[in-house]
């Protein structure tokens, strides 16, 4: 069973709809027992880094998710969910993240021709292979974000060019992140979710 983690973070309905389209058994839950028994976890998210971590802490889910990852359960963070995977965020204030991947989440600097938030379709550039990256080179996916994860190159699988090289997919061990919205990225996005689910079997 894939568990989509419930912490009032926005795009859960779209993620569940995409998984249903793939015929995947999934459930929205904040139940610690279900989370640590899951075959895989998806941490979605739309909103601000500090508020998200505060809500996860309030529900007692930070320790639970860390326990699940330590057990080897695959975790996919989407959009804000990916940003929460790193050590800290600098949105509004400095806030501790999960720390699964070293690095920080910081604001994209607006430049001529590159407004913030970064919103719309961008082509992916695969930097290194992971279980989720097959067939992604040059494919377009949908982004909506103002912050990005600044992490070491060894954890960056896929990037997009947005005045700077923005990490679009990161991973370390059983922890994966997608800065874009696979659930809003058509067949390409569904393919990424399918690869993640296959990884969890």
UniProtKB/Swiss-Prot annotation:
InterPro entries named in the record: Class_I_gatase-like (IPR029062), GATASE (IPR017926), Imidazole-glycPsynth_HisH (IPR010139)
Location in or out of the cell: Cytoplasm
Domain Glutamine amidotransferase type-1 residues, every copy: 1-201
Pfam family, one: GATase
Pathway in which the depicted protein is active: Amino-acid biosynthesis; L-histidine biosynthesis; L-histidine from 5-phospho-alpha-D-ribose 1-diphosphate: step 5/9
Keyword Lyase attributed: yes
EC numbers: 4.3.2.10, 3.5.1.2
Listed SUPFAM superfamilies: Class I glutamine amidotransferase-like
UniProt keywords, alphabetically: Amino-acid biosynthesis, Cytoplasm, Glutamine amidotransferase, Histidine biosynthesis, Hydrolase, Lyase
PROSITE patterns assigned to the protein according to its UniProt record, in alphabetical order: GATASE_TYPE_1
List of catalytic residues: 79 (nucleophile), 181, 183
Signal peptide limits: none
Subunit text: Heterodimer of HisH and HisF.
Protein name in UniProt: Imidazole glycerol phosphate synthase subunit HisH
Gene that encodes the chain: hisH
């Amino acid at each position: 069973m894939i568990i989509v983690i419930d912490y009032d973070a926005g795009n859960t309905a779209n993620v569940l709809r995409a998984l249903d389209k793939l015929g995947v058994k999934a459930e929205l839950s904040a139940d610690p027992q279900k989370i640590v028994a899951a075959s895989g976890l998806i941490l979605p998210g739309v909103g601000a880094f500090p508020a998200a971590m505060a809500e996860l802490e309030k529900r007692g889910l930070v320790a639970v998710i860390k326990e699940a990852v330590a057990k080897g359960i695959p975790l996919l963070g989407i959009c804000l969910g990916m940003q929460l995977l790193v050590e800290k965020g600098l949105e509004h204030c400095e806030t501790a993240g999960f720390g699964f991947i070293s690095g920080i989440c910081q604001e994209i600097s607006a430049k001529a021709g590159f407004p913030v938030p970064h919103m719309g379709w961008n082509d992916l550039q695969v930097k290194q292979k992971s279980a989720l990256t097959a067939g992604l080179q040059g494919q377009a996916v949908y982004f909506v974000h103002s912050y990005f994860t600044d992490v070491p190159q060894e954890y960056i699988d896929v990037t997009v060019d947005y005045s700077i090289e923005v990490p679009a997919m990161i991973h370390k061990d059983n922890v994966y992140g997608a800065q874009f919205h696979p659930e809003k990225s058509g067949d390409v996005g569904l393919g990424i979710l399918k690869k993640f689910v296959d990884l969890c079997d």
